[in-house]
């Protein structure tokens, strides 16, 4: 069969699949997409089923029930279930900055220019999905961002709201000129501008149709000082991911972290007083810790106000060739927990998580063939949640309760929505966690993090008068395009405005603040302008 004949048959098959999907939608019938694809492929004698991207491309732009069809065809709906499209990009490979002080990298770190995986960035192998996309793009930020946005769009996702995650080691240790160009290109990828000037790129990004709602930067406590925090505000950064790995000073020293746990706690306070959301990386099963100390360190982490971050990534220790830990393992001086013990530990950690914390990840994305010892399965979260069911405990972190995830995994919808408030002290400040929830079904629709800063805050926007700080405002549910509404979804239904009004009331009458400021993604500034906020340095502020 000629190439043109095959292309014609594939196009015909895609059109028939779309027609049957529209018919089933009209008749309110549930249809098995895989069975439909196989039947149509067999009819046209195709050797393989049409790809999802081809079927999506075959839907006419003015098709009746297009949005409903897209929901059925969307690949990996979890990607935008939280209301935004997350786009991970990597900076160029560079050496870890603390090699200059300690003489080497952390004992468990697999990547970097001096490792067995020499074309990879620090702490990555080069075989993770994000790493492979970065290598294909030769670490060009513009190519990485455009490629990933187009890929998500072709898979049926709404990509009007994008959050960047900058991975690949300590970004803030790279030269300033490289950092500025890198961030400018990320903003250009959404706005279509071609400027190399950082401030100009940010201005264009504010007006862009595809909004940059936030940037997350991976860093270390020694690259999270005043000057680094100020620089990241200029980029449009709203969240920091800080490598902690352990709350024990002896473990930080023995694993060659190059910083103390005391420095970590000081960084958390500084970052939160500047308005950032703080996410940490923690590693259970490190050398010389043991099960009892592991459980105790997570109790300490969630209960001690010196820690208590907004989010957490759990990375159980992996033994990978070329690392110091690999040598310890090979000579019998280190041994991982058994798979059953590890699942048990993760289940016990998840039971401790407070409702204002989000568990972003539970294991690394490193391919199993590269792992000499450690996690043996790719579904550790699922196994841990099943173990929790057996033990009669429940995970109440944000991700487990948010409305988008409940719809994707359990097809559960909220019924009676209420405003809930939780207050706690953390990192020298008073934190208020406001949320709209269905308490009966334990479903979270939207949240707001309000902070009365500690007296160590240094930003001039906050020191001249008492100021309260909104560090996060997020309404969950599948992503809805900007300027659009969907009565079946929760974004753009007014929950964000209501949460902000309550935050303003608390700031004025309970904190005694004269001003309320929001750390806002570059693309979200117009939203706050409509609510009476004005640009105040890198923040959006309103006098109370």
Curated annotation (Swiss-Prot):
This protein's record includes keyword Metal-binding: yes
- What if the gene is knocked out? Sensitive to methyl methanesulfonate (MMS, causes DNA breaks), thiabendazole (TBZ), sirolimus (TORC1 inhibitor), thermal stress, and cold. Abnormal septation during thermal stress. Global protein levels are unaffected.
Q: Quick one: which residues bind [4Fe-4S] cluster?
A: 96, 106, 109
The residues covered by the Radical SAM core domain are 79-369
Cofactor(s) demanded: [4Fe-4S] cluster
Q: Which UniProt keywords apply?
A: 4Fe-4S, Acyltransferase, Cytoplasm, Iron, Iron-sulfur, Metal-binding, RNA-binding, S-adenosyl-L-methionine, Transferase, tRNA processing, tRNA-binding
| Enzyme's top EC category | transferase
Q: InterPro entries, from UniProt?
A: Acyl_CoA_acyltransferase, ELP3, ELP3-like, ELP3-like_N, Elp3/MiaA/NifB-like_rSAM, GNAT_dom, Radical_SAM_C, rSAM
Note accompanying the cofactor annotation: Binds 1 [4Fe-4S] cluster. The cluster is coordinated with 3 cysteines and an exchangeable S-adenosyl-L-methionine.
Might you give the EC number(s) for this enzyme?
A: 2.3.1.311
A single GO BP: regulation of cytoplasmic translational fidelity
| Listed SUPFAM superfamilies | Acyl-CoA N-acyltransferases (Nat) (SSF55729), Radical SAM enzymes (SSF102114)
Relate the assembly described in the record: Component of the elongator complex.
Q: Which family does it belong to?
A: Belongs to the ELP3 family.
Q: Which NCBIfam families match?
A: ELP3
Name used for this protein in its record:
Elongator complex protein 3
């Amino acid at each position: 069969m000629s190439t043109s004949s095959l292309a014609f048959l594939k196009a015909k098959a895609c059109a028939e699949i779309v027609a049957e999907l529209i018919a089933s939608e009209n008749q309110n019938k549930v249809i098995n997409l895989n069975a439909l694809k196989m039947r149509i492929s067999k009819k046209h004698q195709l050797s393989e089923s049409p790809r999802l991207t081809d079927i999506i491309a075959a839907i006419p732009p003015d098709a009746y029930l297009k949005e409903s069809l897209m929901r059925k065809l969307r690949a990996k709906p979890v990607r935008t279930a939280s209301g935004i499209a997350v786009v991970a990009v990597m900076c160029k490979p560079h050496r870890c900055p603390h090699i200059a002080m300690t003489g080497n990298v952390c004992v468990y770190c697999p990547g970097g220019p001096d490792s067995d995986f020499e074309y990879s960035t620090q702490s990555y192998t080069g075989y993770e999905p994000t790493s492979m996309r970065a290598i294909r793009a030769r670490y060009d930020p513009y190519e990485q961002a455009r490629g990933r946005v187009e890929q998500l769009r072709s898979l049926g996702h709404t990509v009007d709201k994008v959050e960047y995650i900058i991975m690949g080691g300590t970004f803030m240790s790279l030269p300033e000129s490289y950092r500025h160009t890198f961030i400018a290109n990320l903003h250009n990828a959404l706005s279509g501008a071609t400027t190399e000037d950082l401030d100009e790129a940010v201005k264009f990004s504010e007006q862009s149709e595809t909004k940059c709602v936030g940037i997350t930067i991976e860093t270390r406590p020694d690259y999270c000082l005043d000057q680094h925090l100020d620089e990241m505000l200029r980029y449009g950064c709203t969240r920091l991911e800080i490598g902690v790995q352990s709350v024990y000073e002896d473990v930080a020293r023995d694993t060659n972290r190059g910083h103390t746990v005391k420095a970590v706690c000081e960084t958390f306070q500084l970052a939160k007083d500047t308005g950032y959301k703080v996410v940490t990386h923690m590693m259970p099963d490190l050398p010389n810790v043991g099960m009892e100390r592991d459980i105790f360190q997570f109790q300490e982490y969630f209960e001690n106000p010196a820690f208590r971050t907004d989010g957490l990534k759990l990375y159980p220790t992996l033994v990978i060739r070329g690392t110091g830990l690999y040598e310890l393992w090979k000579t019998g001086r280190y041994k991982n927990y058994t798979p059953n013990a590890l699942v048990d530990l993760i289940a016990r950690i998840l039971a401790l998580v407070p409702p204002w914390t989000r568990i972003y990840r539970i294991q690394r994305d490193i391919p199993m063939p590269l792992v000499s010892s450690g996690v043996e399965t790719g579904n550790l979260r699922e196994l841990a949640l099943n173990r929790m069911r057996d033990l009669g405990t429940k995970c109440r972190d944000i991700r487990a309760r948010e409305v988008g995830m409940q719809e994707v995994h359990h097809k559960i919808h909220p019924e009676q929505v209420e405003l809930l408030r939780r207050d706690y002290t953390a990192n020298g400040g008073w934190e208020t966690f406001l949320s709209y929830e269905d308490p009966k079904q334990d479903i979270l629709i939207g949240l707001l993090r309000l902070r009365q800063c500690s007296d160590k805050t240094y930003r001039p926007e906050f020191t001249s008068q008492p100021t309260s700080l909104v560090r996060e405002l997020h309404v969950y549910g599948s992503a809805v395009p900007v300027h659009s509404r969907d009565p079946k979804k929760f974004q753009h239904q007014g929950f964000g405005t209501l949460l902000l009004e309550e935050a303003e009331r608390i700031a004025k009458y309970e904190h005694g603040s004269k001003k309320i400021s929001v750390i806002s993604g570059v693309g979200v500034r117009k939203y706050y302008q409509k609510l009476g906020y004005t640009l105040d340095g890198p923040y959006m502020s309103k006098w109370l």
